[in-house]
Amino acid sequence: METELMRIGVSLPDTLLSKFDEIIEKRGYSSRSEGIRDAIRSYISYYEWMGDIKGHRVGTVAVIYDHTKRGLSNALADIQHHYSHLIKSSVHIHLDHDNCFEVIVLDGDGEEIKELAEAIMALKGVKFSKLTTVASNEKI
């Protein structure tokens, strides 16, 4: 059960807010606040799932970032070199003049994979990142 509501302020780019407003309208939320609460719950759930990544895993990190952000491309390369023992392959796609999409295929210890993903997520200029893994011994 949730406790009393707290009022907060958030600064967002116009384009992000416009897209969010479209989604909350399509989903039938009664207000932006309800949409934001739902988004935060989803983020918390994903973060808790990430905390449970243990054992041998295979997976991907998908990243969209602004390559014009000073030092970002080098920081991404440094992280990938640091965790090169986990990386099996990567694909780099130029989305437009400023934005790149990268998919990194991983195989190794779940804790280290999580560390790599969190290091990328923390970089300024990363617009989107998503870690997806599966235990390598799961039967499909």
Swiss-Prot record:
Cell membrane keyword on record = no
Cited InterPro entries: Acetolactate_synth/TF_NikR_C, ACT-like_dom_sf, Arc_rbn_hlx_hlx, CopG, CopG/NikR_regulator, Ni_resp_reg_NikR, Ribbon_hlx_hlx, TF_NikR_Ni-bd_C
Any note on cofactor binding?
Binds 1 nickel ion per subunit.
Annotated GO biological processes are:
regulation of DNA-templated transcription; response to nickel cation
Cofactor(s) of this protein: Ni(2+)
Spell out the family assignment given in the record's similarity comment: Belongs to the transcriptional regulatory CopG/NikR family.
Protein name in the entry: Putative nickel-responsive regulator 3
Organism listed in the record: Methanosarcina acetivorans (strain ATCC 35395 / DSM 2834 / JCM 12185 / C2A)
